[in-house]
């Protein structure tokens, strides 16, 4: 019997420390034999799944063995392994605990399709979740989930989710693109220390019908003339606001005529956006 055959025989019958040592064997055939060892328990299988260099064929074999997947730690270890086939992980997503799905979306290097599927699953669960879990997700959830929570507009959640480190400008703008938002959402964004000074967010707040007039008027001097003109076009904002936009455009034109040619008359935060 050759050395490889002997190692496979050892893997099939090993127990105790010998079995534990074989969990780190480099030969995939030995590892496959270990999976058939009746002494292999869930804890040892989880140790095996912690090997980042584990061959894909081992992961596929574990995924095929339904009795092994009855153990949640094994299921989780398989789903989180970077070499697990994408279709296997997608199938396991439905069986993971909520916060494990959140953690999966935040893994460095997670494939885009897999991350999006995990986020979609989290968003689909939101209507059934109690407030306490939503608050946890508002603090720690990925960008798309944070954006969905922001759009829901729960008073206890808005401030928390706006402070979420993963929340992106794109998600804030997506929320503001909805005409029907709980009033607290628009007000909280307009008062937030980070988002209220972001140019594109200010622009979206000016567009939004629920924005307080005082907030909108305070932003007008910071907008570029081209954006003011676009906003003042018919049908973009209420007629009651258009007159203020048109007045601001005229003020800029008069100021520009009085200034030296080429001198910028927009506010400092809009200088890089001016025509």
Summary of predicted features, one role per range:
Residues 1-275:
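Alpha-helical scaffold segments
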């Amino acid at each position: 019997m050759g050395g490889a055959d002997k190692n496979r025989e050892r893997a099939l019958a090993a127990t105790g420390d010998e079995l534990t040592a074989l969990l780190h064997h480099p030969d995939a055939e030995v590892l496959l034999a270990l999976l058939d060892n009746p002494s292999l328990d869930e804890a040892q299988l989880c140790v095996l799944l912690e090997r980042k260099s584990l061959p894909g064929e081992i992961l596929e074999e574990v995924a095929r063995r339904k009795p092994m997947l009855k153990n949640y730690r094994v299921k989780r270890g398989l789903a989180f392994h970077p070499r697990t086939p994408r279709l296997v992980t997608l199938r396991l997503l439905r069986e993971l605990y909520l916060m494990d799905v959140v953690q999966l979306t935040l893994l460095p290097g997670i494939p885009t399709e897999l991350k999006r599927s995990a986020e979609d699953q989290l968003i689909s669960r939101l209507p059934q979740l109690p407030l306490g879990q939503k608050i946890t997700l508002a603090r720690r959830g990925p960008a798309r989930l944070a954006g969905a929570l922001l759009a829901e507009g729960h008073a206890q959640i808005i401030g928390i989710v706006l402070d979420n480190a993963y929340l992106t400008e794109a998600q804030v703008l997506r929320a503001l693109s909805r005409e029907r938002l709980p009033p607290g959402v628009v007000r909280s964004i307009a008062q937030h220390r980070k988002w209220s000074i972001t140019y594109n967010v200010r622009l979206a707040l000016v567009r939004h019908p629920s924005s307080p007039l005082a907030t909108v008027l305070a932003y007008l001097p910071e907008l570029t003339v081209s954006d003011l003109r676009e906003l003042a076009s018919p049908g973009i904002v209420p007629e009651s606001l258009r007159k203020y936009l048109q007045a601001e455009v005229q003020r800029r034109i008069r100021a520009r005529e009085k200034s030296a040619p080429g001198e910028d008359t927009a506010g400092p935060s809009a200088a890089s956006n001016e025509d």
